[in-house]
Amino acid sequence: MPLSPLQSALSILPPDANEAIVSDHFVRSALLPALGFDSTEIVAHYPTGNRYIADFAARKNRENAEEKLFLQEPKNPSLLVEVKGKNWNIAQDTSKYREITEQLRNQLLGAKCQSTKWGIITNANHIQLFRKHGKVIFPATKCLELAVENVDEIVRKIRDKIEHPKRALTTTIYNNKGGIGKTTTTINLGAILAFLGKKVLVVDFDFNQRDLTNALGLTSHNGFIVNLLTQRATDLAAGIVTYSFRGKIKSFTFDVLPADQQMVSCDEVKLQQQAPGVHTFHEKLSPLKNQYDYIFIDVPPNWRWMTQLAMYAADVVLLPTKHNNFFSLHNVAVAIKDFLPQVQALKDEGTPVALPIFFNGEVMTDPQKEAAINEIECIIRDYQKKGFHLRPYFFPKWTDAKKDTHIHHIPNYAIIAHAHFKHVPAVYTNRTAFNYYLSFAMEYFLQ
């Protein structure tokens, strides 16, 4: 049987093919055409609007005859590709892998790439697809090893993902320490994004506390989640209710999946045996991911099966901490090193991945901030010795040239917590709270 164009391109590459050869003889001539782009839809050396240049940018031409071809007017690419030579080892978790993914991340966040949804890294030995949702960049596949035998199937799956993107970003809010403000974060982050016109679903998966459900003045389910996890016919959409707040000028709404009070007395071991697997909630949630822009899941402070269900359903994990809570900082490192990889190993996408931490609430003096930064530096050094690179999760703006220890801080503000008594998100009734969470959403989620 004759080789396909992808197989032929891969097979003729010399073992030490440099970046130029991989770019010309694999990416431009075979990979991008296999992904559905013709020569007028591909531009090399694309300036992304900051100081970074992508090796390739691509975008399907519009059907509007009056609009120029992407080659003629390269604007609003849908895909960027970063290429390296075969001597670059970009296998997962290598130093070169971290370097190339950071390059791609910087390119995707360029001013000329606000519409870009996809990024690819490849050296013709490996390939990985990344999804960009606003400012959030996360894996859409694992870093896959290429061979003549599998290249067609791998690229076919990548093309399918690119052509059928999920609308929603699914975020689980987690810390193994209680009292960190996960529920308050979930409510107000969802509410501020709804205010900005986004379609939002928040999920209360903390069945013992049910704080999110109660804070919004909603009624808990009585057996719905049990049925959802054990009965194939139960549709998640049937359990969703709409929270509405009527302002002076307009109303704001977002959807909620309330907690299930029956889960409190449920035998989790028996429930786990009855459910199809840890993928159960993910599969029930998946059809709704094209109906929402953002889905937020509030989970309990533990690593039991229900928390793992929510993690499996997530693209990313948001990790609130407190600067004066030693354990909340150390629990972040444990989650990134131990807990998240357990879930990533089970999924084809290699998700969820952690977003950078933030300090949630509490008044923070300069000496307290310095103490927290020093403790974080100790955590980073300790895990560095074990081969884990945690600095980007604690100090996302750190570079070799600029040792920036910035950590986003949502300050302590009594109105935010007091708003729960009124069953109204604080961002809908208080300007200061509104600005806190708007700043948070802009830094973490919106481009």
Q: How would you describe each model-predicted region?
A:
Residues N290, Y294-T399:
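Conserved catalytic-core segment of NTP-binding enzymes
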Residues F207-P258, P396:
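Phosphate-binding loop that captures ATP/GTP phosphates
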Residues N89-E99, T219-L228, C266-Q273, F327-N331, ...:
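Short, flexible/disordered intra-domain loops and linkers
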Residues N188, I192, A215, L309:
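Active-site signature of alpha/beta-hydrolase-fold catalytic machinery across serine-
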Residues A237-R304:
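Cytosolic-facing regulatory segments adjacent to core modules
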Residues R167-Q209:
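Walker A/P-loop phosphate-binding motif and the immediately C-terminal alpha-helix
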Residues M1-W118, K132-L169, V363:
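A short, conserved, highly charged catalytic patch centered on acidic carboxylates
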Residues I410-A441:
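C-terminal boundary of histidine-terminating zinc-finger modules
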